[in-house]
Amino acid sequence: YNEEDVKKAAQMINESERPIVYFGGGVRSAAGCQPLRDLLEKTGMPATYTLMAAGVLSYGEPHNLGLLGMHGCYAANKAIDEADLVIAVGTRFSDRVALNPDSFAKRAKIIQIDIDPSELGKNVDVDLSLTGDASYILQAILPYVKKTEHKLWMEQIRGWQKNDYKPVDSDTELKPHQIIDEICNQAGPEAVYVTDVGQHQMWAAQYLHHTKSRGFLTSGGLGTMGFGYGAAIGAQMALGRDARVVMLTGDGSFHMNLNEACTAVSYDLPIITVIFNNQVLGMVRQWQTTFYEKRYSDTDPHRKTDFVKLAEGFGAKGYRAATPAEFKAAFADAMKQKGPSWIDCRIGKDEKVLPMIPGGGTVNDIIME
């Protein structure tokens, strides 16, 4: 990038009335969390992010609209649709975000910032591209942008947020969002959260409220099931045994690499594994329910694994929970353990990740129930 492009980007930001920052894992890789936050605070722009950037901004920050894309927030997707300027930082406009490239941010000019020049304008046409480290470019832009608040734009977005999907609590059944809320309440903002791949991964990205910068580890892009336990072990070893590491997984993903429990037990690593056990391959099954008239194929493996006995066989501590009260008690006890523990959370096989925008669709096609 050069100084003229930096000044042009700043000018486009200064002249826009409805700007939004859309950022991805490149911001995390570039250690660009604080430069991004500085830009948002000075300009008053809202921001939304991809799965790979979850945790870069904390959940309660006023500029944070939440996750974007197929399973993203209604308000975030609507804001992209209505924006007059999109600043895309460290992201590639994947098919989980730009579900319909021809309709993506159709009212907006687009600035794309990426370290890889081959990504610039590859999936979506852009008006200005800057090649380089996201952290340095954001810092370079900052002196040239005006301090503003975009009050009218933010008021409009707050109105859309009233229509964001709101899950319903239950006292008798274990709901995914309640599991994650309880994890947040007990493990807190200093914990490192790791996921496998599947529905639980999306629920984690949607509902983990306390993640700190670089405190959310997940496998996006390739979406490799079985990633979680090995990643959790790596995080625990890197941070030390006194750190809190929580691994969220599904029964499908966990079956693919649960042999890693041998390593966790051998080294007495106090990793808490929370298994979202719906006894199906839930993400694919959700697609079959929604788009293929409930023609289920290869998503119900009819497993009868007893995770509590399996944990004990490995030398870990095992729990089972079917209600919010049972999960609260199990997680509290797991927090006291000196070695690895697993909590088998029994959830319904028809639980869905919502909202959902179908592939090729737009925010106008969003499914809320």
Language-model segments: what does each one mean?
Residues 1-15:
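Conformationally flexible catalytic loops at phosphate/diphosphate-handling active centers
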Residues 45-52, 111-114, 271-276:
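Short internal beta-strands
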Residues 53-156:
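Glycine-rich, acidic loop regions that bind phosphate or pyrophosphate groups
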Residues 75-94, 202-281:
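Thiamine diphosphate
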Residues 82-83, 137, 289-330:
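Conserved thiamine diphosphate
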Residues 97, 324-369:
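Glycine/aspartate-rich loop-and-adjacent alpha/beta segment that forms the canonical ThDP
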Residues 126-138, 259-277, 356-358:
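A short alpha/beta connector and helix-capping loop motif
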Residues 158-238, 355:
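Active-site diphosphate/adenylate-binding microenvironment
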